[in-house]
Structure formats: structure tokens, C-alpha cells
From Swiss-Prot:
Protein name (record): Arginine biosynthesis bifunctional protein ArgJ
Note in the entry: Was identified as a high-confidence drug target.
Molecular function GO labels: glutamate N-acetyltransferase activity; L-glutamate N-acetyltransferase activity
Complex and partners: Heterotetramer of two alpha and two beta chains.
EC class: transferase
NCBIfam families, sorted: ArgJ, PRK05388.1
Location in the cell: Cytoplasm
Active site annotation, chain numbering: 200
Pathway in which this enzyme or protein is active: Amino-acid biosynthesis; L-arginine biosynthesis; L-ornithine and N-acetyl-L-glutamate from L-glutamate and N(2)-acetyl-L-ornithine (cyclic): step 1/1; Amino-acid biosynthesis; L-arginine biosynthesis; N(2)-acetyl-L-ornithine from L-glutamate: step 1/4
Reaction catalysed by this enzyme: N(2)-acetyl-L-ornithine + L-glutamate = N-acetyl-L-glutamate + L-ornithine; L-glutamate + acetyl-CoA = N-acetyl-L-glutamate + CoA + H(+)
Feature type site, description Involved in the stabilization of negative charge on the oxyanion by the formation of the oxyanion hole: 127-128
GO cellular component, one term: cytoplasm
Length: 404
């Protein structure tokens, strides 16, 4: 693709290795019984190693989350090791020791490879079934393998994106090439237990922009609050949610904070849309927008209430324009409401005006895969948007058999 001067490009064919200064790899370590790729490494070659992260708000945190939160108090990372096929959550002190051993093994392998690295510079992420210990013999052998398989080109990033998948159908990655000649790349996984507080997600973002840890943290927190925290598929919140942002500084370009914020936001927003599109059992991609609320917080609460309502979600699965279920859902939200002021539209077609059904409401066509629900509460200026999906037979089937 030809680069045009003054343009910023967003490319889904690229990921964490699009920015200069990063290598990555994905290998099959044997953690998954299927033999699929299940161990990924993202390595920062520098010259800078600034980093930031945001994590699950679930009080039950997996061992890798506890480890990586400690590591990030330094504001510095050289590497991120990620496994799928096991969450290493609710595994007690032994599970934390496994995480520590993984970081030590990565540090030793990188040092042997030629880059002196300490365990305190290695973030660890895991995803999969909660409650089981990881097969450490396979994982540690895989660490040595993945270090030697690292690529600086796009292939390594693609392999890493595949290796972190669990019930995902497709890998999620994207890169933004800024017109000032610096780049932000990213990869993510997540298909079930998607809810605010990130989204059962592992996400690694990389940039070759020169930025301090505080600048990265500001950009990341703002982006996560506007994107991942507003993706709500099933109301469940994972023990393992982790989003990391690493800077190599290899471009030697220090962007303005506003430019960095915008670039990270655009990458996170695109990854969020990919997560929504590949959610478990999804047949409809749904956007719930609430306007006219007393406050933005009220709008967000109302939008979440609608997005999580099982009757709304099953109606959408059946392409049924059942606006009454939307009103019933929003009526349960603990916010300021006047039922006689509420209006609802589906895909721009009015189905309820001031609390009463609109002519032709039952004939609105919701057969397309994308559905926009807009609810105007009519009591203020607050507004918010939530991404969600329908609730299908496939979702129930997949989650009823996940551990077996």
C-alpha cells in the first residue's frame, strides 16, 4: 500500500511488530491438547523500555495479574510472555510461584540469547480455564523455543496473535501508522466473559514513539475507559484481564500527548470492534446509545442495563424489534427517569416515542448483522455508548461445555 504524505493509516494486517524495535513469536508448547499455538512472546529491543498497564477490577485476580502489577511499578518492560490454554487463576501460592518461574525462565532465555534481562522486566499473562495449574514442564520448554523463534517482521506478530486465542475464531491485531512517522500496534484476544473492567482480554500494545511511563499510562487509561470498559457481552468479568502498552522509542520521535492519546484510542477502538465481532456465539453486533440522560454516568448505567438484559439480547437474536423489552430494561436502571419522555429507535427507525409505540414499530427490519439501539431519556444532556451482542443458541452451547 502506498503511503501518502500527511496521512495516518490503520492496518489490520499488522500488529505488535509493526512499530520499530519489537520482535514477537508464537509457538505450540503443548499446553493446549489440540496442538495449536499456545505460547506467545513480545520482546522490546529498545532503546527505551517504558511501559504501562491496566488490569481487571475483579477482586479475584489470577497469579499473572498479581505478578505483572508488581512488575509495572517500575514503569519498565522488556518482554511479555503470554499463554493460552490455562488461566493460572485460583491456584494459590503454587500458581504464583509458577508465574515467577515463567518470568525467570524468559529472563534467562533472553539473557542467553544476548540481551541481559531480569525477571522484574518480564510481564506474564495467561488465559483459559480457571482453577487448574499450568503444565510447567511444557511451558518452560516452550519458553526456550519461543525466544529462538522471534521475528522482527510482521510474521512474528501474526503468530503471537494466533497463540493467545482461546475460544476466539480469528486473531485480532491492528497497527496505526502516524503521519509523523511513528507507529502504534496491538493484538488482543477475547470472546467470552466480556464485560467492563476490560473484557476477558489479553491485549498488548506497542509503539516506537518516545514516551515516558506517565504519558503511556495516561494514554492507555483514557483509551481503555472509552473502549474496552464499554464492551459488555455477558456481564461477566474475568480474573485475568490485562492490557499492556510498551514503548521502544526506536523512532526517536516524542509525540504530543494529545497525538499519543488519539493514536492509542484508535488502536484500542479497532481491537474492541474486532472483539465484539468475534464474541462467543455472536450473530448480531449491537451498539446501545443512551442520550438525554441527567448525567453521563446515568447514561452509562442505562446503556449497560440494556446491553446485559437477556430478554433484549434474545429478541435481537431473533431479529425481533421488541422495543418493550428495551423500556422494561432501562426502567430497572437506578437513575433519574420519566417514562413519558423515553423514546427508542432501532437502526434509526422510531419504535417508541415518549413512552408509546410508534406506527410500524413491529415491522422494523433487524435482519442485518449490525443493530443500533438509541434510547433518548429526555431529561438532560448525558450520553454514553456500549457495544454488545445478541444471545444465541451457540453462546449457551459453547459456555455450557467450556470446562469439559
Amino acid at each position: 500500500m502506498t503511503d501518502l504524505a500527511g496521512t495516518t493509516r490503520l492496518l489490520r494486517a499488522q500488529g505488535v511488530t509493526a512499530p520499530a524495535g519489537f520482535r514477537a513469536a508464537g509457538v505450540a508448547a503443548g499446553i493446549k491438547a489440540s496442538g495449536a499455538l499456545d505460547l506467545a512472546l513480545v520482546f522490546n529491543e529498545g532503546p527505551d523500555y517504558a511501559a504501562a498497564g491496566v488490569f481487571t477490577r475483579n477482586q479475584v485476580k489470577a497469579a499473572p495479574v498479581l505478578w505483572t502489577q508488581q512488575v509495572l511499578t517500575t514503569g519498565r518492560l522488556r518482554a511479555v510472555i503470554l499463554n493460552s490454554g490455562g488461566a493460572n487463576a485460583c491456584t494459590g501460592p503454587a500458581g504464583f510461584a509458577d508465574t515467577h518461574a515463567t518470568a525467570e525462565a524468559v529472563a534467562a532465555a533472553l539473557s542467553d540469547w544476548g540481551t541481559e534481562t531480569g525477571a522484574i522486566e518480564v510481564a506474564v499473562c495467561s488465559t483459559g480455564l480457571i482453577g487448574d495449574r499450568l503444565p510447567m514442564d511444557k511451558l518452560l520448554a516452550g519458553v526456550a523455543h519461543v525466544v529462538h523463534e522471534m521475528h522482527g517482521g510482521l510474521v512474528g506478530g501474526d503468530e503471537a496473535a494466533h497463540a493467545i486465542m482461546t475460544t476466539d475464531n480469528v486473531p485480532k491485531q491492528v497497527a496505526l501508522h502516524h503521519h509523523d512517522n511513528w507507529t502504534v500496534g496491538g493484538m488482543a484476544k477475547g470472546a467470552g466473559m466480556l464485560a467492563p473492567s476490560l473484557a476477558t482480554m489479553l491485549c498488548v500494545l506497542t509503539t516506537d514513539a518516545a514516551a515516558e511511563p506517565a504519558a503511556l499510562e495516561r494514554a492507555l487509561r483514557r483509551a481503555a475507559a472509552a473502549t474496552f470498559d464499554r464492551l459488555d457481552i455477558d456481564g461477566s468479568c474475568s480474573t485475568n484481564d490485562t492490557v499492556l502498552l510498551l514503548s521502544s522509542g526506536a523512532s526517536e520521535i516524542p509525540p504530543a500527548q494529545a497525538d499519543l492519546d488519539e493514536a492509542v484510542l484508535r488502536v484500542c477502538d479497532d481491537l474492541c470492534a474486532q472483539l465484539q465481532a468475534d464474541a462467543e456465539g455472536v450473530t448480531k453486533r449491537v451498539t446501545v446509545t443512551v442520550t438525554g440522560a441527567a448525567t453521563e454516568d446515568d447514561a452509562l448505567v442505562a446503556a449497560r442495563q440494556i446491553a446485559r438484559d437477556s430478554l433484549v439480547k434474545t429478541a435481537l437474536f431473533g431479529s425481533d424489534p421488541n422495543w418493550g423489552r428495551v423500556l422494561a430494561a432501562v426502567g430497572m436502571a437506578p437513575i433519574t427517569l420519566d417514562p413519558d419522555r423515553i423514546s427508542v429507535s432501532f437502526n434509526g427507525a422510531a419504535v417508541c416515542v415518549h413512552g408509546v409505540g410508534a406506527p410500524g414499530a413491529r415491522e422494523v427490519d433487524l435482519s442485518d448483522a449490525d443493530i443500533d439501539i438509541t434510547v433518548d431519556l429526555g431529561v438532560g444532556d448525558g450520553q454514553a455508548r456500549i457495544r454488545t451482542t445478541d444471545l444465541s443458541h451457540a453462546y449457551v452451547e459453547e459456555n455450557s461445555a467450556y470446562s469439559s
